[in-house]
UniProtKB/Swiss-Prot annotation:
Keywords: ATP-binding, Hydrolase, Iron, Iron-sulfur, Metal-binding, Nucleotide-binding. The keyword Transferase does not apply. Belongs to the Mrp/NBP35 ATP-binding proteins family. This is Iron-sulfur cluster carrier protein. It comes from Clostridium perfringens (strain 13 / Type A). The gene is mrp. The lineage of its organism: Bacteria, Bacillati, Bacillota, Clostridia, Eubacteriales.
Length: 284
């Protein structure tokens, strides 16, 4: 169950249930044409470069390990990175015409080693590093189509890797997607926390429940086992308290994970590392 009990805005948020958790009821919004999705979870950050996509990949991997049917929608249209995390960046999603004129299409997502279904702009383009040079309405229109027209089949969880900040995409997802709750990713700096707080305030104004915050790059672990906080003397709990959110967990700076990401082996590394199971244990 989600926990909004520590949120300063819980009395104003229609997503907060009487017992202090996020309401399980989700208002009818944008639907899917192919498949059924039980839970839609948004993963978001206030700024780029804090490891939001990495956290999305870690959470998706942990859910798949538990036996859940999981999908990932890479909503960062102009800066997609989920295919790289899962090592599927050389593959492409199939686009199937559903009528004779080709006006209605179906996207067939790419599956990872654990069976996670992924759709991303980079899986729909011929060349991975070609830029997407579109204005807001075009970007949001394509994102809506990726959500509606992907063949998700049956999913227990769809994780949406959202772009950072409070842009058009964020507004579109919060307004029109059937988001159950958000997981916010931050790093231990006051400047980052200040910007994240804007995002938290936006979520409350949009009546979107925030499950809590994951603090990434919280520390480096010495070979002796001591945790060294290199970016802030404040604890993760203090940063979470400033945001008015429960602390889901803290992730270290991990060079082995970085190397696995570079080699397209992050999913395998995360699945085998007990640290990530412990951090997200009990979240879903």
């Amino acid at each position: 169950m989600g926990s909004c009990a520590s949120c300063a805005n819980k009395d104003k948020c229609s997503s907060a249930s009487k017992d202090g958790g996020c309401s399980s009821s989700v208002p009818a919004k944008l639907g899917t044409n192919y498949g059924n999705i039980k839970n839609v979870i948004g993963v978001i950050s206030g700024k780029g470069g804090v490891g939001k996509s990495t956290v999305t990949g870690i959470l998706a991997t942990q859910l798949a390990k538990k036996g859940y049917k999981v999908g990932v929608l890479d909503a960062d249209i102009t800066g997609p990175s989920m295919p790289r995390f899962f090592g599927i960046n050389e593959k492409r999603a199939d686009i199937v015409a559903m009528d004779s004129e080709g006006k209605q299409v179906k996207f067939v997502p790419v599956k990872t080693e654990l069976g996670i279904k992924v759709i991303s702009m980079n899986l729909l383009m011929e060349v991975e590093d070609d830029p997407v040079i579109w204005r807001g309405p075009m970007v949001t229109g394509v994102l809506n189509q990726m959500f509606k027209d992907t063949d998700w089949e049956e999913l227990d969880y769809l994780l949406i890797d959202m772009p950072p900040g409070t842009s058009d995409i964020t507004l579109t997802v919060m307004q029109t997607f059937p988001i159950k709750e958000l997981v916010i990713v931050s790093t231990p700096q006051d400047m980052v926390s200040m910007i994240v707080k804007k995002l938290v305030t936006m979520a409350h104004k949009m009546n979107v429940c925030v499950r809590g915050v994951v603090e990434n790059m919280a520390y480096i672990e010495c070979e002796c086992g001591k945790k060294m906080r290199v970016f802030s003397k404040k604890s993760s709990e203090e940063h979470a308290e400033y945001l008015g959110l429960p602390l889901i967990g803290e992730l270290p700076i991990n060079l082995d994970l970085t190397e696995a990401l570079e080699n397209g082996k992050a999913e395998e590394y995360v699945a085998e590392n007990p640290l990530y199971s412990l951090i997200f244990e009990g979240l879903y």
